[in-house]
Regions:
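Hydrophobic residues in alpha-helical segments
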Residues: 28, 37, 59-61
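Conserved GNAT-fold acetyl-CoA-binding loop/helix
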Residues: 34-54, 66-68
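Short, surface-exposed helix-loop/turn micro-motifs enriched in polar/charged residues
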Residues: 39-40, 62, 91
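Short helix-to-loop capping/linker segments positioned immediately adjacent to catalytic or ligand/cofactor-binding
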Residues: 57-59, 108-109
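Short loop/turn motifs at secondary-structure junctions and domain boundaries
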Residues: 58-63, 153
Length: 207
């Protein structure tokens, strides 16, 4: 897929560029990012250069991951990363993807991650035809869960022993979002609305 750019009131979500490597490297030195994400630790300059120069563009080209650099419209600084991952089921009857993100420490607490997530959700549902979006995080990642809840994800439970990190099995929280979950929010920049009905009929279990 050809990379796209999304714009919100305060942010630009654009493809990563080679010039982003220093900012990505600096952000990923903060311990919470490798602790709660798949970012390796220690995270070197070579890792950042490979991510922005190879991994991110290949994800768009191969339709395996759609990663956005989240940047401030005010000064161009890198706020974080956000994208759709695990896209193997996007072009199957399940029409499913997973939302992932991290935010640089100095930009947390300002609503940027929620604002960016709403733009990506809208794009996923409207333009990509996603019918079920999932959120996964290692159990205990309260910051990620707070963002997921704010954009409307329904918490579905805990996947026991689903993740192996540092040779230890760990639990994973899972949430889901359907197009029909989204309320209308006309006029708000970066809003997801109007919530479209699911394209494939949905028969929820009545029990």
């Amino acid at each position: 897929m050809k990379p796209v750019t999304l714009t919100t009131e305060r942010l630009v979500l654009r493809p990563f560029e080679p010039s982003d490597a220093p900012a990505v490297h600096a952000a990923c030195q903060e311990p919470d990012i490798p602790r709660w994400t798949s970012v390796p630790a220690p995270y070197g300059v070579d890792d950042a250069e490979q991510f922005v120069g190879t991994v991110a563009p290949e994800g768009w080209r191969d339709d395996t991951t759609y990663n956005f650099a989240v940047a401030s419209r005010a000064d161009g600084s890198l706020v974080g990363a956000m994208g759709l991952v695990r896209l193997a089921r996007l072009h199957t009857p399940e029409r499913q993807a997973e939302l992932g993100y991290w935010t640089a420490k100095e930009h947390r607490g300002r609503g940027y991650t929620v604002e960016a997530a709403r733009a990506v959700l809208r794009w996923a549902f409207r333009d990509l035809g996603v019918e079920r979006l999932e959120w996964h995080a290692e159990a205990g990642n309260e910051g990620s869960r707070a963002v997921a809840r704010k954009v409307g994800f329904h918490m579905e439970g805990t996947l026991r022993a689903q993740l192996v990190r540092e040779g230890i099995r760990r639990d994973v929280w899972i949430g889901s979002l359907l197009p029909s979950d989204l309320p209308g929010e006309s006029g708000a920049s970066g809003s997801v609305a109007p919530g479209a009905p699911d394209a494939t009929p949905y028969l929820p279990y009545p029990g």
